[in-house]
Amino acid sequence: GLDENGVFHHQLVAAADTLNAGVHFPDDTAAYDIGYNCLAVNLSDLAAMGATPRWALLSLSLPQADAKWMQQFSAGFRSLAQTHAVALVGGDTTRGPLSISVTVLGCIEPGRQLTRAGAQPGDLLVVSGSTGGAACVLDMLKAGKPVSDRRMLDQPQPRVRLGQCLQGHASA
C-alpha cells in the first residue's frame, strides 16, 4: 500500500515465457487462443507467487504481416488482460518464425510472496485444478489423435485470485 507520503511499499515480481509455433502450440491454433494463452501462462506464474499482475510486455516474431491474424491475437490477449487489469506497456515485433515472448510484472507485499524455498519435508502438497492437461492435449494433437476439447491447452485459466488468497497460508 501507500504510506502517508505516497511511498509505494510493494515488491515488484516478474515472470517471462516464450511460446513457439509447433513446440508450445500446434500450427493450426487460432490466433485468439495464442494471444490468450501467451498471457495466461505468465499470469499463472504470478499466481504461483501470490502476486497481483499489473503490466505486460509482449514481443512477437511473425513470418508475415497479417491484419486479421493480429486482430484476433490482440482480442485474445486483451480479453484476459482486461479480466486481470493488466496493462500492455511495451514490447517489440520482428519478422521470423512465429514466436511470442511475454513478460508480466506484478506487485506483492514484502515477505508475502509464495516461493518453493518455503517447502519442507512432510508438508501437505495441494494442487488446484488438474496437472499435465495442456501437455497431454498437445501430445495428442502432435500424434494426430482426436481431441474433443482443447481448452486446457488453448485457454488455461490462471488462478490469480487463489494465489493471492494463499498468501500467509502456503509456502509455495
Spans of features found by a protein language model:
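Helix-biased detector of long, well-ordered alpha-helical tracts
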Residues: 1-172
